[in-house]
A protein has these predicted regions:
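Intrinsically disordered, low-complexity regions enriched in small/polar residues
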Residues: 8, 12, 37-38, 91, ...
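FMN-binding flavodoxin-like domain, especially the glycine-rich phosphate-binding loop
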Residues: 3-4, 27-31, 47-51, 55-166
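Short acidic low-complexity segments
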Residues: 33-45
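N-terminal beta1-alpha1 ligand-phosphate binding loop
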Residues: 2-27
Length: 166
């Protein structure tokens, strides 16, 4: 059976999603790759790996705009979220994203993991904590930030490798 041609298109604000994209590219046959990188154009490949970073519980704007254009594609979604550690949260994000995908497409896989955030985010949380009437969950948000510093890690990338099939 001949392997389908594919494209890997991603948006990466901090480098986390690019790391996932690089991992997918390592697993798949290079000869079958039509495109690898950032793009707003609809790919010619029938199979498309679409990478995103999470913004307020959904994919980034550029990725959502691209997904809305796709028709009759086999789509593998992959992404990162600074707020992570919960499969329930990841499923909620993926559910939001799928609402932007035309029903003519087929989702062939999906993967999300936590990703590190810029240090400025932690600094903002610490500053907010200095306020007398700060949000009660700031300690949890700071712990989450610290937990995210090592992600995506080797375990995250190994899980992704196992999910990617040609």
């Amino acid at each position: 059976m001949e392997t389908e041609r594919y494209s890997i298109i991603f948006s990466s604000s901090t480098g986390n999603t690019k790391e996932l994209a690089d991992t997918i590219y390592e697993v798949l046959s290079k000869e079958k790759c039509d495109y690898f990188g950032v793009s707003k154009e609809e790919p010619q490949s029938d199979k498309v790996y679409i990478g995103f970073w999470t913004n307020q519980g959904n994919a980034d704007k550029e990725t959502l705009e691209l997904l809305k254009k796709l028709k009759n594609k086999k789509i593998f979604l992959f992404g990162t979220a600074g707020f992570g550690g919960s499969q329930e949260y990841f499923q909620k994000v993926l559910g939001q994203i799928k609402e932007n995908i035309d029903s003519s497409n087929t989702i062939i896989g999906e993967y999300m993991c936590q990703g590190k955030m810029p240090q400025s985010v932690r600094e903002r949380y610490v500053k907010m904590k200095e306020q007398p009437n700060h949000m009660p969950n700031l300690d949890m948000m700071i712990k989450n930030f610290d937990r995210a510093l090592s992600h995506p890690d080797r375990n995250d990338l190994d899980k992704l490798r196992k999910m990617v099939v040609e």
